[in-house]
Amino acid sequence: MSNEMYYVQASDPAILEKGECGGAVTALFKYLLDKGIVDGVLALKKGVDVYDAIPTFVTSSEDLLSTAGSLHCAPTMWGGIIKEYLQDAKIAVPVKPCDMRAIVELAKRAQINLDNVYMIGLNCGGTVPPKTAMEMIKLFYEVDPKDVVKEEIDKGKFIIVMKDGSHKEVKMHDLEDNGYGRRVNCQRCDEKIPRKADIAAGNWGVIGEDAGKYTFMEVCTEKGKQLLKDAEKDGYVKTKAPNPKGLEIRAKVESSMLKMGEDYKNKWLEEKYPTIEEWNRQWNKCIKCYGCRDVCPVCFCRECALTADYVDTGSIPPDPIMFQGVRMSHMAFSCVNCGQCEDVCPMEIPVARIFHKIQEKTRKELGYRPGVDDEAPPALGGSCPTQ
């Protein structure tokens, strides 16, 4: 289908006030819950502060407002949660591009039924680890991180809002040049608008007097088209045609961010890519905690070949080449560059970098993009296993 584009705004005053950019995403979730189309909405709600996000399954539209708004300092991955706990439920979920790609890859493996999932994609410029965010706010913004009540990434800047309503901002380039800013995998991301979702939403392209009051929505599937049509018909949202200039600006923003991602990809996967000797030093730090395996959203085997000991009893440390080699042979074709494996590694091994590097080589050789292409990964021989 040819994707249709709209400016969309929530009709509910409470959602308008609390929601991001007109609250359209929250309004669509409310429609799905109120009409009984889904059993619940899987989303994040703020915990004690902006660095603390709590995954929550909302089953009543009255509780949706607690999930409204963005949390860039709390990276979370939905694919594994849906696969493990919500396989049989009908759900709606807001997805970053890497979330979307993981869900699509799991669907190819018969681990998620896409007929049961409404994906509302969120345009994404990247996320920041909570610890990094607190450190950089203290260092670069010279304020107490606990006094920050809101943050956002806009026009190449990381912006914070304080308790007193004041704003402070620093260019993302300046932060990242000093080892802070977005997660490294986000820096080299090559998917900014999640068009495999049913609807892709964001603020890019909303300009003039509409800025901040409407959400830009690109309808990507027939399911998404019907959802928006029905939600408007029943008075949950209002839509209007986007400003033509806004369409141009949105395309330029996406193009600019993709170019930036390619530059960072060259930096981290080529110029600063570890040598074999450096990798050997990194792998020798591995303690076989299984964190990288357990957090990977695309890993799904019920009986894992890595669970059994892969060294003789009493041998320490374990052979990291065997452990990571098996993982790479299983997953590198389908790495969605979510960075979760690197986030959880207690030894701070840059695991995601080698997986992304191998996936890039696969893509160049075979043309396969995990979570974007419709066919099964080449490693699966064109067929998807059921377990």
Curated annotation (Swiss-Prot):
> Where are the stretches annotated Disordered?
366-387
Q: What are the residue boundaries of the 4Fe-4S ferredoxin-type domain, all occurrences included? A: 275-298, 326-355
Q: Which domain of life is it from?
A: Archaea
Q: Its Enzyme Commission number? A: 1.17.98.3
Q: Which cofactor does it need?
A: [4Fe-4S] cluster; FAD; Zn(2+)
The cofactor note reads: Binds 2 [4Fe-4S] clusters.
Q: What class of enzyme is it?
A: oxidoreductase
Q: Which UniProt keywords apply?
A: 4Fe-4S, Electron transport, FAD, Flavoprotein, Iron, Iron-sulfur, Metal-binding, Oxidoreductase, Repeat, Transport, Zinc
Q: Which residues bind [4Fe-4S] cluster 1?
A: 286, 289, 292, 345
Q: Name one GO molecular function term.
A: 4 iron, 4 sulfur cluster binding
Q: Where is the signal peptide?
A: none
**Ligand binding ([4Fe-4S] cluster 2):** 296, 335, 338, 341
General remark: The genome of M.maripaludis harbors two sets of genes encoding the F420-dependent formate dehydrogenase (Fdh), fdhA1-fdhB1 (Fdh1 isozyme) and fdhA2-fdhB2 (Fdh2 isozyme). The Fdh1 isozyme is the primary Fdh and the Fdh2 isozyme may not play a major role.
State the family it belongs to: Belongs to the FrhB family.
**Biological role:** Catalyzes the oxidation of formate to carbon dioxide, with coenzyme F420 as the electron acceptor. In vitro can also use methyl viologen as electron acceptor.
Among PANTHER family, the record links this protein to: 7-HYDROXYMETHYL CHLOROPHYLL A REDUCTASE, CHLOROPLASTIC, FORMATE DEHYDROGENASE SUBUNIT BETA
User: What is the protein's name according to its record?
Assistant: F420-dependent formate dehydrogenase 1 subunit beta
